[in-house]
Amino acid sequence: VSPSYPAPYNDPSQWGIVPAWGFASIEESNIPELTPGTLLHGFWPTSSAPTDLKLQASEPSGNWVEISEHRQQLMGFYNRYTVIKTSLPVSAILDAQHVSSSYQDELDRLGWLAHFQAIWRAGYFLARYVFPSQKEQKPIYPLGDVAGVPWTKEDADLSSAVVVSLSAAGKTARSFAYSFERRSKETAPLGFLQVTSAVEGLSQATQSAAPPFPSKTIGYGDLSDEELVQWIKDLGPSKFVILDFGARDGALKRLLEIIKVKASLEASKIVIIQIGSQQKVLIIGSPLIL
């Protein structure tokens, strides 16, 4: 929050602004390549107030990195800003409801970009760099190098693993699956299990992708099914990589019980990566509404 905001909302230790992926137009700049009117895509506070950025040129051309000290503990993903070339005047973007119909296609393109670009990148980075799809690729810790935590080739190795996607129909999970199901045989897992409330749609998507490894899609209610237990046993994994994209309450616990008790794989190494959380709305004075 800005110190110029009225009290008490100018206290950054108590207040903040919810961020979101989207676009902003440059109003003032001391970087010659970024002139006023340039459109940037990135992570912004959901506010009409001006935002100050300290940007440094990056690769490829048109990409910029926020290097302010207070943002250095963020994943690099959140500090990257991209110049977006568009034929639309800024006024049309700010007042899309009254824009000429001739600009509608371009507005639609920007809308899709705002909604899906960050989600698509998140899933791609996870499939491509955290668990590299090429053996010679150096793996990167899930929170990025900024975390300072080692992530070795052994950590990223999936050759003896079953990979599990919880809340597999979520947007980030779908992005991950799209890239993951198209990796080569040499970096393939033993199997890929998707747990979702949209079994039919995901099953069709996986069938179309034709991944080079066994894949199974089940509903939350099928987690304790004997057929699933046998499927896991037949694969003979010594490692489970569980990607929790925001599963229903209790899903992760039930899965761990199946692995350790029903499938008799208590000696297996288990890696859990929490990527999302179940959305909940809490109304003060009322029960929790899901």
Question: Which stretches of residues belong to each language-model region?
Answer:
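Glycine-rich phosphate-binding loop and adjacent beta-alpha segment
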Residues: 253-290
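NAD(P)H dinucleotide-binding glycine-rich loop of Rossmann-like/cofactor-binding domains
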Residues: 43-160
